[in-house]
Design a protein with these regions (language model features):
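Short small-residue beta-strand/loop micro-motif enriched in glycine and branched aliphatics
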Residues: 71, 150-154, 164
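Short glycine/threonine-rich catalytic loop with a Thr-x-Gly-x-Asp
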Residues: 136-140, 158-169
Length: 175
């Protein structure tokens, strides 16, 4: 999800004419590579929790899509992994965008004294996908609800229900 979300955010900023810099874990055709040095003020970085590399960053905004069993060989326990995410969140300067449907993520967010905005499908987040429909096998569309108002309709060109979360994160960040 990190690469897709980073790509979606970079694409949205590009299409808005903001010319962002980007470091992405996968190739984004729009920018012809894995990253670019833009002339705008925005920098989009795909951060990874492996060996605490994300703790070297001090983001202005951050997105937490989920906290799952990845890298428990390094952290030793889910508690230690959650603590690393808490430290990452505390280094965020302005706002954290968090998946309201991921219990581990919300366990961490509830402990913070930071500005947090949530997104999700099942739980009532600040940004929520409602009226989710599969318009062809594996591809989804939905209405975007921001706070309590429907503000648009999104039809994803990438397959998988998980990409609804990636798109919600992009919408929240780019708002």
């Amino acid at each position: 999800g990190k690469t897709t979300t980073t790509s979606m955010i970079t694409t949205a900023l590009e299409l808005a004419g903001r010319d962002p810099s980007a470091v992405i874990g996968g190739k984004l055709p729009l920018i012809h590579g894995y990253g670019k040095a833009g002339k705008g003020d925005d920098i989009v970085i795909e951060a990874c929790e492996f060996s605490e590399t994300f703790l070297k960053l001090t983001p202005y905004l951050s997105v937490v899509l989920n906290i799952d069993n990845d890298h428990l060989d390094y952290y030793g326990s889910m508690g230690e992994l959650k603590f690393a995410f808490k430290r990452f969140a505390l280094m965020t300067q302005f706002m954290i965008f968090a998946n309201a449907d991921d219990k581990n993520t919300m366990d961490v967010m509830y402990t913070l004294d930071r500005r947090v905005r949530t997104f999700g499908i099942d739980n009532d987040g600040d940004y929520q996908a409602i009226n989710v429909q599969e318009y062809k096998p594996g591809f989804f569309e939905f209405d975007l609800k921001e706070w309590s108002k429907v503000t648009g309709h999104i039809r994803l060109a990438v397959p998988g229900r998980h990409n609804i979360y990636n798109a919600l994160a992009m919408c929240a960040v780019c708002r």
